[in-house]
Every structure is written in C-alpha cells, then in structure tokens.
C-alpha cells in the first residue's frame, strides 16, 4: 500500500510539473502574421504581464541565455536558434536610465512607448522575434527605427543585427546591410534614432512561415536599452497565373498569312 501511495504521489508531482510547464510556455501567440504589418507599440494594453506576449500576435521576446559566452560579440555572428532560452519581457517599465535587468522590456511609461533590448551577463544575446506569412508576396521589405533609450552615464557600444530564416528550425541568416554597429550614444544622451530599411532576399518570398529577428549582445561596460520601434513589413502581390479561360489562343503567323480557299478553288490548280 505504501508503494502504491508513493507511486501516486510521484505521478501527481510529474503531472503538476507538466501543467506548470505548459502554463509557463503559453505566453505567446507565434501565429505567422500576414503582410503588410505595422507595430508601433502605442497600445499599452498589449503587454500587461511579465513574459506574456499572447496579445501581440506573431511577436515573442527571448532572453538569449548562453547564445554567447563572451562579452562584446558582434551579434551578426550569433545565428543559432536561441528559442530554448527564456521567453522575456519586463512589462510596464518607465525608467530606462535605471532599469538594470537585461533581456527584453516594454517601456510604456515614457512619452513614446516601445519594446527594447538590452544585453547582460545572463541575457547574453536577447532578441525580438517576428513570425510572418509571405505566401503570395514578393519584394518583401522591413523597416524599423532603433531608438537609444538610456540617457544615463552609460555609453556602451550597443550593436543590433537583423536576421531571418525559413520555417522554425535551423540557424538564422544575417543580413549585413541591416547591421547597426552602435545604436546608442552617450553619456547622458538618449536622442539617437536610427532608421533601417532592408529588403529580404528572394527565398523569403512566398513562404507560409518566415521568421525574422532583431538581436543584440552583452556589450563591454554597462549595456544600454535599444528600442525596436515603428516596425513595418510591406510587399507586393505575386500576380496570379492566367487561367485557361483568359489565356490568349496561340496563333500560327505563317498559316494566317495565306487566304483561305474553298475545295473547288484548290482542285482548279
């Protein structure tokens, strides 16, 4: 009887762990979003609870634990998956100058709300992920603004890279033209805004599930918060192929150039 009781207790503990695990992971809606898409983070109700992205379809922030073990790494070189790290967002923040934790944060207590990234020893390469559906689209372009939010004495070199991949597995591919070597200025400055526009390669067109991400890395010195704002994804429609009913019939120029003859005319020669 004691053995059965112990087995039941063990089973209950495992079941509880599974339930808690599922609950902790149910914090995001990673449904691929249709294009065009715009996100300016002006709606403060989208992120109301720490680590909960469920009201922001397609977007998920990750802390990027252990994606790199070195300080000052160029995030262009960090292309591994990273989605097994903790889902991250510090909700309802208002003091980017003094908020020291690293990862992803929502600053809705500032005049122009935004979601931002900041590296740290734990959050070695935090990133913001966006799931997209580009099926039926070509010439896919992404525009956004990197905003320096930290007006304190901090003056780190805070780089930001932009990457993509097809589907949800494998390494990301960096887009060098989108790289910003230092998205912040200082000390005691928080005015820099860096607009970026990038065209995705042809292989990113016409995809049911495409992932893009903004990623930074733990910098030398005290890292600074960098906002990822004014996100816009645009594209052109891929024209539908003509149907049989609308296709023009093929012609034979050589035959059409000759006048038609009746059987009688033909026999007279």
Predicted feature locations:
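Boundary/junction segments of secreted and surface-exposed precursor proteins
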Residues: 26-44, 240-265, 269
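A long-range scaffold signal marking pre-active-site subdomains of enzyme folds
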Residues: 31-82
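Terminal, low-complexity interaction segments
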Residues: 33, 70, 120-122, 132-137, ...
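Short beta-strand elements bearing conserved aromatic residues within extracellular beta-rich modules
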Residues: 160-162
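Bacterial N-terminal signal peptides that target proteins for export
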Residues: 2-13
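Bacterial N-terminal signal peptides
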Residues: 11-21
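C-terminal substrate/ligand-recognition segments
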Residues: 140-142
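Surface-exposed, low-complexity/disordered Ser/Thr/Gly/Pro/Asn-rich loops and linkers
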Residues: 61-136
């Amino acid at each position: 009887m004691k053995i059965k009781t112990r087995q039941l207790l063990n089973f209950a503990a495992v079941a509880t762990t599974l339930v808690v695990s599922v609950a902790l992971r149910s914090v995001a809606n990673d449904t691929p979003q249709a294009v065009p898409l715009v996100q300016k983070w002006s709606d403060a109700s989208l992120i109301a609870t720490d680590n909960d992205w469920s009201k922001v379809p397609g977007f998920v922030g990750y802390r990027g634990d252990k994606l790199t073990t070195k300080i000052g790494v160029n995030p262009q070189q960090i292309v591994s998956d990273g989605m097994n790290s903790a889902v991250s967002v510090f909700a309802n923040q208002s003091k980017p100058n003094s908020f020291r934790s690293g990862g992803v944060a929502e600053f809705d207590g500032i005049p122009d709300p935004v979601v931002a990234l900041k590296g740290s020893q734990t959050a070695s390469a935090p990133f913001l992920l966006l799931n997209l559906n580009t099926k039926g689209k070509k010439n896919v372009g992404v525009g956004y603004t990197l905003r320096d939010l930290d007006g304190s004495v901090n003056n780190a070199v805070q780089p930001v890279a932009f990457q993509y991949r097809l589907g949800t597995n494998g390494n990301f591919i960096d887009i060098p033209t989108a790289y910003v070597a230092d998205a912040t200025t200082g000390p005691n400055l928080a005015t820099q805004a860096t607009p970026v526009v990038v065209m995705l390669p042809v292989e990113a067109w016409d995809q049911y599930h495409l992932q893009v991400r903004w990623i930074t890395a733990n910098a030398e010195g005290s890292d600074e918060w960098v906002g990822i704002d004014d996100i816009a994804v645009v594209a052109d429609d891929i024209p539908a192929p003509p149907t049989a009913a609308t296709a023009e019939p093929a012609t034979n120029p050589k035959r059409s150039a000759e006048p038609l003859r009746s059987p009688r005319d033909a026999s007279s020669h």
